[in-house]
Structures are given as C-alpha cells and as structure tokens.
UniProtKB/Swiss-Prot annotation:
<keyword id="KW-0808">Transferase</keyword>
<keyword id="KW-0418">Kinase</keyword>
<feature type="domain" description="EF-hand 2; degenerate">
    <location>
        <begin position="469"/>
        <end position="505"/>
    </location>
</feature>
<keyword id="KW-0067">ATP-binding</keyword>
<dbReference type="InterPro" id="IPR050205">
    <property type="entry name" value="CDPK_Ser/Thr_kinases"/>
</dbReference>
<keyword id="KW-0597">Phosphoprotein</keyword>
<dbReference type="GO" id="GO:0016020">
    <property type="term" value="C:membrane"/>
</dbReference>
<keyword id="KW-0677">Repeat</keyword>
<feature type="binding site">
    <location>
        <position position="483"/>
    </location>
    <ligand>
        <name>Ca(2+) 2</name>
    </ligand>
</feature>
<feature type="binding site">
    <location>
        <position position="452"/>
    </location>
    <ligand>
        <name>Ca(2+) 1</name>
    </ligand>
</feature>
<feature type="active site" description="Proton acceptor">
    <location>
        <position position="256"/>
    </location>
</feature>
<comment type="similarity">
    <text>Belongs to the protein kinase superfamily. Ser/Thr protein kinase family. CDPK subfamily.</text>
</comment>
<dbReference type="GO" id="GO:0005524">
    <property type="term" value="F:ATP binding"/>
</dbReference>
<feature type="binding site">
    <location>
        <begin position="138"/>
        <end position="146"/>
    </location>
    <ligand>
        <name>ATP</name>
    </ligand>
</feature>
<feature type="compositionally biased region" description="Basic and acidic residues">
    <location>
        <begin position="47"/>
        <end position="72"/>
    </location>
</feature>
<dbReference type="InterPro" id="IPR011009">
    <property type="entry name" value="Kinase-like_dom_sf"/>
</dbReference>
<feature type="binding site">
    <location>
        <position position="489"/>
    </location>
    <ligand>
        <name>Ca(2+) 2</name>
    </ligand>
</feature>
Amino acid sequence: MGNVCVHMVNNCVDTKSNSWVRPTDLIMDHPLKPQLQDKPPQPMLMNKDDDKTKLNDTHGDPKLLEGKEKPAQKQTSQGQGGRKCSDEEYKKRAIACANSKRKAHNVRRLMSAGLQAESVLKTKTGHLKEYYNLGSKLGHGQFGTTFVCVEKGTGEEYACKSIPKRKLENEEDVEDVRREIEIMKHLLGQPNVISIKGAYEDSVAVHMVMELCRGGELFDRIVERGHYSERKAAHLAKVILGVVQTCHSLGVMHRDLKPENFLFVNDDEDSPLKAIDFGLSMFLKPGENFTDVVGSPYYIAPEVLNKNYGPEADIWSAGVMIYVLLSGSAPFWGETEEEIFNEVLEGELDLTSDPWPQVSESAKDLIRKMLERNPIQRLTAQQVLCHPWIRDEGNAPDTPLDTTVLSRLKKFSATDKLKKMALRVIAERLSEEEIHELRETFKTIDSGKSGRVTYKELKNGLERFNTNLDNSDINSLMQIPTDVHLEDTVDYNEFIEAIVRLRQIQEEEANDRLESSTKV
C-alpha cells in the first residue's frame, strides 16, 4: 500500500468524475475586472483584498440565517475547454472576453435607504450594538468596512464586517450577501477556515461577526521568521491545499485564493493559518461551469479569462501561491493587467532561472502539474495532497532556500503595501486640487511620456505635499523599504484613479457612520 495517502477525512482515490458535490451558484463583491481599453485602467491595489478581515479562534452559538435560501441558478454551459492559447486571434478573443463589462442586472433596483430591518437576512437578529461594542477599523473595501468588536457578555474580541444596504443595488446583490453568510455557515468548524460567530441586520447595514486573526499575513510571517526551507513551504502548501480540498468536498469554490487571504490566528510559532474572505466564493454543482471573470490578476487561471471554468481554477491559484512561496516572484508577470493576462494565457513557465536550480525536482514537478493550462489535465486538490513533495513523510528537503527568495518575498509584499498606504493616506489628506496637481507633477517627471514613474520619483512627488501629509503614516510611507527597488515603476494614472476611487469610498463610509448613529 505504498502510495496510499490520507488527508483529513479523505484518502487518495480521487477522480475528476466524483470530486465535486453539492449545491448551486455564485457569490459576489464586484470582483476585480479589467477595464475596456477606452477607459482608465483600474489598479489591482484596490481589489477586494483591501477588505481583509484581520480575523482568533472562538466558539459560540452563531446567530445565522435560520433557513437556507435556494440560490438562483447561474448560467452554466458546455464542458471545460482545455485548448491552449496558441494563435494570436484566440489570445485576443480571450483578452477581449476578460475585458468585457459585467452584464447589467436584469432586476429591479432597490431603494436601499428604505430597506426594512429583516429585508436581507429575512429573520430578526437583534441589533449588533445590543451585543457588541465596535472598536478600531481593520480595513475596508468596495462593499464593506471591517472593525474590531468586543462581545459585551464575555469581553471576547471579534472582527465585524459591516455592509451598508445602500450598496446593495439590486436583488442579486442582496442574494450575494445572503450566500456569503450561508457559505461561511456551511464551512463552520472546518480546520483552517475562518469561523463566523453571527450575522445581524438593522435598517442601515448587514453585519457579519467573525473570529479575529491578529497573527499577520502569510508572507509577512515567513519574512519575519527568517528561517525558510522547502519543507516549511511544503507544510504551508499542505495547509492551503487542505482548505481547497475541504471547500471542494463540501461543494464550495473559493475563487480568490492568494496569500493576502490567509492569516495567522496569533503570533505563536505554531499558530493556525486560516483562509478568510469568502465574498467571491460560490456553491458548486457537479459538472457546473461559470463565466464571470473574478479573482486577482497574478493568481487568475487561464480558463477564468476564457469565461468557462470550474473548481480547477482554485488549483491554478494555489499553484501560483506555491510558485511564489518557492521563488519570491509570480510565474506570470506584467506591468499592466493586459500584460499579466497575456502571460497567464500563453507565457512560458520559468523553472530554470534563479533560484529554481536550487529547488528540488519534486517541487517543480508539482508546480508543472498544478499550472497545467488544460484544466482537465490539472491535478485535483486531493491529488496534490498525495504528491510526494507535499505529504508529511514526503521528500521536500529541509535545507534553507536561497536567501534571494526571502528578499524577493519581502519586496513582493512591501511593494503592494507601499501602494496601498500611499493611496489611503493621500486620499485622506489631499484636496481634489492637490490630487490634480500631483497628477501634473507626475506628468512633468515622466519625461519619456511612458505613463509610469519610479518609486523614487513617486516618493519625491509626494514630498512636495509634506505639510498636509505630516503624520506617522506618511513617515512610514516616506521610508520606502530598501527591498523595494527604487527604480521599479508604477502606473501613475492607475495610482491617481485609485486615489479618486478611495476618496469616494471614504466619503461613503463617513455618511454610513453618520446614518448608522442616528438609527437603531
């Protein structure tokens, strides 16, 4: 029985035909979508991951939906297309497909300000503030804001994600919120998956109370610890694929797997790593395929861009994560979304340049099988967990990885954080006139008219407004990490557009807080 492998509750006898079970449809949250060519590109930094819930293990009787809603059927279609993109016409067709606008909802618009208290969850939940005190803000995104909240009866801390009803523009948006809660309820108690404590609704918002994770993000923990080997990477990969296998076996597809959506519960060395943010997740029927383009550019599967995909797309995303864990860089890279998508569709997988010569052949074999462009030939989550490199008794070496991997991981994480910090601080502190002036400053710096400036130029441009940006956030912002190459570039038009969008979100949040304080 040498090749028998057991993981959690399932053994290694998986096939494509019996892997996926359970109900229905689709989840929401204005997924990251590339824009049409005649519109300003939308920056990746404002994806839904900004709404991360820094989510601590706790238990209790969750106050959830009493009855399961029967989700509406999503348009599904023919079997999975396994063809590689090999000609220019096919590639352009796929890119155009990914760049298409989201279809307009064919339903009546709701007057969200007038929604009754039970209109979303369809059950009386009581008011959040009867049971919890709200604390500091943890993060925000297009649909909601996450706060620390403290349970009045126990003093336990949780994370509370509040979704204003005015952002639920139609019946489908309301269904999506119900389904996100239902999916978290469906996964309740599963290891390495964030737990939901309860759901509440008032006349202004829907509130999801979840466990609070204070141990930080996946990449930050790796860099902080300093000691990093293939065996450690294999252990982390096993946790990630264990989450995927658990979700798939319960008929759920995550659809937004990436390092930012995995958080440690606490700072302990053996802290559990948990998957968070199921806002784009969906229930799945056997053989069901989906057509909406969702996810994050570096981690998106080619069949998602082709608008015909199933749970195999989660395996691709997890494969990209393992590639980054072992090399510190993304396998398919570009300076714009379109360049990234081109690489995802037909770029060559690099497993030969540094640091790959020092990585084991077993690890590279697994990555090739997970980043197989034909989803029919791609490994399932169960098969990945049975691969020799990832098993507990497997062959992942315990020798340290090349030091460049850690430095690349640090840069990979720090660059994204720099952009997000700059966006948030600028949007909070600069007037519209100053933001316009900042754009003109970048245009002056950009003598080659490339539309891009280096991080050093970005820093210098921001320093002109230092009188308005005089706080601890800006001090941190101006201390660009040494691991972030100052000659790397950022698209300043994307940067400015993201600032404008973030200002709108912040103004809306202020209005929501005012409205919520006057209503119970």
